[in-house]
Amino acid sequence: MRIARRWLPVLALVAAPLVPPLAAQAPAAARPGAEHWRALHWRNIGPEGNRFSAAAGIVGDPLTYFVGSASGGVWKTTDGGVNWRPTFDAQPVQSIGALAVARSDRNVVWAGTGEAHIRSHISIGQGIYKSVDGGESWLLMGLERTGRIARIVIHPADPDVVLACALGTAYGPQPERGVYRTTDGGATWALVLHVDANTGCSDLAMDATNPRVLYAGMWQIEIHTWGRTSGGPGSGLFKSIDGGVTWTRLRGNGLPTRPHGKVALGLAPSDPQRVYVMIETGDGVPWNGQPTEDGQLWRSDNGGRTWALINKDRNVMGRAHYYSRMAVAPDDPDEAYFLTASYAKSIDGGRTLTVLPRAQAPGGDHHDIWIDPTNPDRQIVAHDQGLSITQTRGRTWFRQRLSNAQLYHVTVDNAIP
């Protein structure tokens, strides 16, 4: 026991150097400086915004898309929809009605302002805008008094030839309603189709195989504070065979003969003779004491010479003033898509519809669709919840909601107005 005690001080002296003094310990970590934060970027996580009213893509490019907001401008993605940037914020108007990209020059993008989906909380526009750098910057190209531009079509080989479908403000009669055409890239415009001051253009389509052939839907519509008056003798279907310079109204031969409302179109890219037209009828209910037609979808298989009523299903054109948009698959004239509150598909030329359940649909309250003419599997749909992209012909969807703002109501304080 005495030997063990004698070694204890020696062991203590040997162990002591193994414990470093406090002064020799590592210094405390320095506070992060500005250089540490430069690699970090803010990411928006909400709240989510309002509806989108227009959509477009670039032929053959699965990564680049554009969407137009009801009151939040134009947004662009270059990574397939994962990240989006607003590119229209510098402009004095943010309500977008139509988008189109020139097939012959992907840098040329057109935006028509003024939402054409009619209901109580919509904004009018201030003309048509053009971008020559892929939607990064914009120039006002006129048509400031057209109110709402529902559709833009561009000549497939000449980006300077453009037609714009102008609905008008729709709050009353005005002369700036109809189809406008430019051949100099928007420097000058000609009103090539004008029915009357009460009627504007609701849709416009160009034959994919022959740009001299176009169809236009015209809509007699007036918005009131208590509702709207849709329909009248001004509404109808028109055709041009000279590139939109002159137009002929298509009457009879199977088309409705009684007054009707909104007209919307769908052309089959793979069959230039196949034309679909959606017409807002009264579904047989009298209008202003007059009988009305009953039907939703008509079809021509001979370029508009004769027509047949194909479908009365309201999933084709229910709540016509707010929806009424369709598209035909570029590789199958019988495959058509119909956008309303629901999302419906036909594979038999419009005779029957399959309505996708909400979980399988792009969204709800659908407003616009763009299909890549070279790859029908690739589509983008704009709707009230945002936008949805598919690479699988609609079997699966990638859904996105953006932080675009929209004002629905304004009020004042009764005590301090």
Model regions and ranges:
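Beta-propeller blade termini and top-face loops
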Residues: 25-417
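N-terminal secretory signal peptides that target proteins for export/translocation
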Residues: 1-5
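Bacterial N-terminal signal peptides
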Residues: 8-21
